[in-house]
Amino acid sequence: MKRLYRNTGILLLMLFFSTFTEQLSAQNRNRQSFYAETYNVPPSVPEMMVFAGDTIRFDRADLRERMDRELIAFSYMHTNSHLVIKRANRLFPVIEPILKENGIPDDLKYLMVIESNLDPKSLSSAGAAGLWQFMQATGRSYGLEVNANIDERYNIRKSTVAACKYLAEAYEKYGNWMTVAASYNGGQNGISRRLEEQHQTNALDLWLVEETSRYMFRLMAVKMLFENPRRFGFTFTVEDLYPYIPPKKEVVVTDPVEDLVKFAEEHGVTYAQLKRANLWLRESKLNNSSHRTYIVEIPDTQAEYYDPSKTKVHNEAWIK
């Protein structure tokens, strides 16, 4: 009888370990499958690419390795790489027509990606604000109103027009878009000085501070990311993308508005909804003592409700 109990105990113990081992094996297989599906392999550096109509070749070791670094970086910056594509679905439909209207190549929209991560509320520690990250003085010099009450660096359309003015001016000076991009980071005075000192005509051939040197290659890497996210290991569904929320109407304002909370209620929206749609309104009132003309967007409150069946995909490459 004792032997029977002992043998039964051994069998039960063997059965337990067999079941436990099989469960561990199944967990390991699932884990291996998960990592196999989510492990990112950076895309290879291409032989060349076209950016804003200019052909850049990567057959020189320094150019190739600088590009490789940024491709690797964007492959593993999961949070930012995911967010910028989600946000682009909402913002690019607004930005692209403005660039086209002002004669700026479409590829220059990627400046916004590396400047602000496509966050319209972005404010750097240095004081640069909005999608295009204008400093106060620079914003004013390109036609933006910047003060405590109104800050048009946060106005998506007006700041994009201002960016177009800067880019067109810089292109007139340099004649190639990669040098224009470098000047957006390093300033026109700084880049012009380096070109003169080093006897070059293209910023890709300059010895620059690390940030500006990397900036140009980050720009090209971002273009590759947006053209084919899957190559970087990122996949999206329609439900993942942020929908464009159009304004229900635009209100022309030429007089002061003492209370924007009341103004919002009169137009059927909350103060928070009004502010989200008009980030350039920095206070709870609009002074406008000079009776300038402002366009205040009244959001479509129904469009703010999440309905993926109505989401328009701006670029089909993002969900393939």
Residue ranges of predicted features:
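An acidic, Gly/Ser/Thr/Pro-rich helix-cap/linker signature
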Residues: 3-10, 18-103
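Short, functionally critical alpha-helical segments immediately adjacent to catalytic or ligand/cofactor-binding
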Residues: 104-121, 180-185, 274-277
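Catalytic and binding regions of secreted/periplasmic enzymes and modules that target cell-wall glycans
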Residues: 167-194
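Extracellular LysM carbohydrate-binding repeats and other cell-envelope/extracellular binding modules
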Residues: 273, 277-317
